[in-house]
């Protein structure tokens, strides 16, 4: 199963579960709880809100020296990515260790081409990531940063961490 197919299937299962919870189909006593309860109110997507992507390069200082056969390093170049939508913010980062062959410049050039303002619904994860993948071949660090930030944003909107959305055990 491809990663995209898995994400699409997981999204449909999550959406279906949310419908059942919202109607009281599986979980009783949860529908209509105010914030502060165990299950947050679902976020309503719509209106004129648009996603906005921004990024900032920085040098990540490693807590411990990282060593491979040919060298050691105490820092790594990094680019932090933010996707903002209707007062919510998702974060991702592109880490570029030397052996990946990507640079801060190449990541920033790629991210400068990404225009998420054409999307009004961050839950269109597959459509958004297909668009991002189609911009250039390669640029995997930059694409991963957008992917991570988008998933973080959707988790923020749902009020849940992804391990819980996917039904995983936090331990």
Where are these regions (language model features)?
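N-terminal export signals
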Residues: 5-28
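C-terminal segment of N-terminal export signals and the immediately downstream linker at the start
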Residues: 22-62
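Short Gly/Pro-enriched turn/cap motifs at secondary-structure boundaries
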Residues: 69-74, 138
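Metal- or metallocofactor-binding catalytic centers and their adjacent structured scaffolds
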Residues: 40-55, 83-84, 89-158
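Glycine-rich, charged/polar anion/phosphate-binding loops
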Residues: 65-68, 162
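Metal-dependent enolase-superfamily TIM-barrel catalytic cores that perform enediolate-based chemistry
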Residues: 164-171
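Conserved N-terminal beta1-alpha1 strand-loop-helix module at the mouth
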Residues: 74-80, 156
